[in-house]
Amino acid sequence: MHRFNPRRSACDRCRGHKLRCIRLDPGPNDTGALLPCKRCVKAGAECIHTANLSVKPPGDGHHSAHRATESPGHPAAFQQETRVSDRQLRESSLGISPTQPAPQRQTQRWSSSSGPHRPEDRESLPPWHMFATPMFSRQQLGFSKLPSHANGPPDDRTADGFEVGSEAALAAPPGSERSPHRTSRAPSDGTTTFSLVDKVFDLDGRAVCPLSGSVLQENAGIVTAAASTTVTSAQTHHMLPFSQVEPLTPSSYFNVPTCSTLTTGGAGSQSLRDQQMQQHQRHGSASGRSSAATQDSCLQLLSQLSSKFLMDFGKSSAGDWSKMANNNTNNHLSTTISNLFDGLQIFLKTIECLRPATFLENSSSDSECSYSDLCDESEFVGSTGDNQMQVYPGAMAVDHAHEGSSTENSAHRRGRGASPTADAAPQPLDMPMTLTILTCYTWLLKGYEVVLSEIYQMLASQDRHQGLQTLPTIVQGVGIGGFKLEDHPDMQIEIVIHVGWQLLQRIEGLLGVRVVSDEGRGGLGGSSRDESSTEGGDGGGAGSSASDERRILDPRAAAAVLDSWFTTTTRGGSGGSGPGEGTGDSNGGRTVEIKGTIANIRKYLRSYGRN
């Protein structure tokens, strides 16, 4: 029968859990070996007994560890085993003669970080030892103790250590500052681990490792990654917060432009002329006319617009709207007005890209200051109030300002005082482009006529004895400054008529056709009109000679196409009930009589005002 060992020989596992260690006595014949305790045997864990260092003065012998090993005589006999670290082996091989045995130095190093120190030990520490990671007990750090080696030597605690590759070696301190209390060492291979890494704080308070200059030069990338990993691991195991080293961002990163599109005020200090120069370089140019790439892109956009206008205005009928309720009619009318104005602006910007290069070149050569002409043109285009209108016109102004490299424009500049001749006249567009432009233009006229017809029918069905306040609101949220137009439906109607009229006049001035701007005099294309005449329509100036110079279509070809589309045997009005007006052909080819519908609308508004 074994007897219980009465002496105090608790193992590390029981001591860490503060439990009573019950160890069997091997008997009177073998007093040097210790059997494993009952708790370790029951748990199947390794029973390790480390000598209590607190009762030994520093420097008196070395600590020993008892490890249970299997032997033929004793199944779980204990043998005394001495541990030697890699650094001690290296120091022995380098000829360093320590004053104490290697295990004793290791014991002193471990006890110096957790136990009391002698005064001479504190004085022998290097200057940066105060910045080293302190090794407190796990109770002080707030962590639970490890069950197997809570009070073991540092070399056994590899779970809390940091692995560093051979490339990220730590720089060793000078020989004069070497001390047995220093814990930093250069690892011997890539798998060597250590539990304590001395860190040096820079002026910003960041924790960095003292890396050697050669390592930084040869393996800068690997060292940075290893140092970041080391500092990050220290955050999770240490009470002091080590901020992770952030990578440096090159200053050129902040100089990258953040906006590539031209919007109102989006280019900062960049002037409108510089924006036009950039657009000209992107799109390219050809001598005497727009480039082929620009024409192809415009043709593709116009084809898409034609399909969109077909869906917006082709299937709309004022007669069908009159059967709907008032609320649905107003919502549909507001949507159609919005689609019409958007279509007019997009179409105007697109055809301005096709404007011939000789217009601004001629006008600028006849004046003393060509820059003023460019400014006036930009203000003319931007007066519509749409921010996106600033994108397309800029390219056209530059196309005309920078086409001077061609032979034709150079010859024209030599004849600065002469008037424009037939040789400098722009070449007309081809037939596919002409037909696509006229198709979109016809759909826009159709949409404008549909809007006016619906407004006319709404006024005709309204009780005029109730006053203007009973008219429904066709445009929501419209105001001029602090003056709200929601309570003034008559002014809203006038705004819709005026804005649509002005946009159509600008489009006709670029195309060289006259349907609404010239009251139909001289034909739809203006071929029989006197070119020197400066008379215009009610919009003013759209039929002037300047408009003839900037047109992009052949007036005769455009007049022939429009005459075949708009002229029918039976003339009819869009909204009308005026004298001499018929029903018109609803199957297509109606003559657009927009002015008659506008006159009828204003007549109804005047009758509301008198009542």
From Swiss-Prot:
Coiled coil: none annotated. CDD domains: GAL4 (cd00067). The keyword Nucleotide-binding does not apply. Pfam families: Zn_clus (PF00172). Its main location: nucleus. Residues 53-128, 169-192, 265-291, 401-427, 521-550, 564-593 are annotated as: Disordered. The keyword DNA-binding applies. Residues 98-109 have a biased composition (Low complexity). Residues 11-47 bind DNA. Transcription factor that specifically regulates the expression of the gene cluster that mediates the biosynthesis of the mycotoxin pyrichalasin H, a tyrosine-derived cytochalasan that inhibits the growth of rice seedlings, but also inhibits lymphocyte capping and actin polymerization and alters cell morphology. Pyrichalasin H is indicated as the responsible agent for the genus-specific pathogenicity of M.grisea toward crabgrass. This is Pyrichalasin H cluster regulator pyiR. It comes from Pyricularia grisea (Crabgrass-specific blast fungus).
